[in-house]
A protein has these predicted regions:
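Thiamine diphosphate
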Residues: 1-160
Length: 160
């Protein structure tokens, strides 16, 4: 949801010290990170996923001591890959969380662009189920990536 991007000045309270920063570009991207702390994992997400991931990242840091740097592109095309590159060079681990089926997505494009730059990294891409979005609430919950799935994946990814 594009309205989520306007709340960058009022993020949730973070006991871990996470803050939003804007990139220095005309149409800026957001970076959610802790100042003076090297991240363990780079997470990329956008839209309606951002607020949920903000809460989840704080939990990962407070409960598991995993520091995540979240990059939130605001303009998907043309994509400004530079903030992602800068983060990946530090972490070597990319976790993409997207509300889309797994084939031909922005997450796939991000991975392809990074590989074309010959950057060495490991990547995990979490997507919705590869099916039609159901109208039933119960089936819809099985369709989308859950916060618990993202949490568990990030925790396992950190240990690799």
């Amino acid at each position: 949801n594009k309205l989520d991007y306007t709340r960058k000045d009022s993020p949730i309270h973070s006991n871990s010290g996470y803050k939003y920063k804007k990139t220095n570009t005309k149409i800026y991207d957001l970076k959610y990170s802790i100042d003076n702390q090297e991240p363990d994992i780079t997470m990329v997400c956008w839209g309606g996923m951002v607020c949920d991931m903000e809460l989840l990242i704080n939990d990962l840091t407070e409960k598991e001591e995993i520091v995540v740097e979240m990059i939130c592109p605001t303009m998907l095309y043309p994509l400004n890959i530079q903030p992602i590159v800068e983060s990946i060079l530090k972490t070597k681990k990319l976790l993409i969380v997207e509300d889309d089926n797994p084939f031909g997505t922005l997450g796939s494009e991000i991975i392809a662009q990074l590989k074309c730059l010959n950057i060495e990294f490991n990547a995990i891409k979490l997507n919705t189920a590869d099916d039609i979005i159901p109208s039933s609430r119960i089936l819809e919950e099985k369709h989308y990536v859950t916060n618990q799935e993202v949490y568990n994946t990030a925790k396992e990814f950190f240990l690799k």
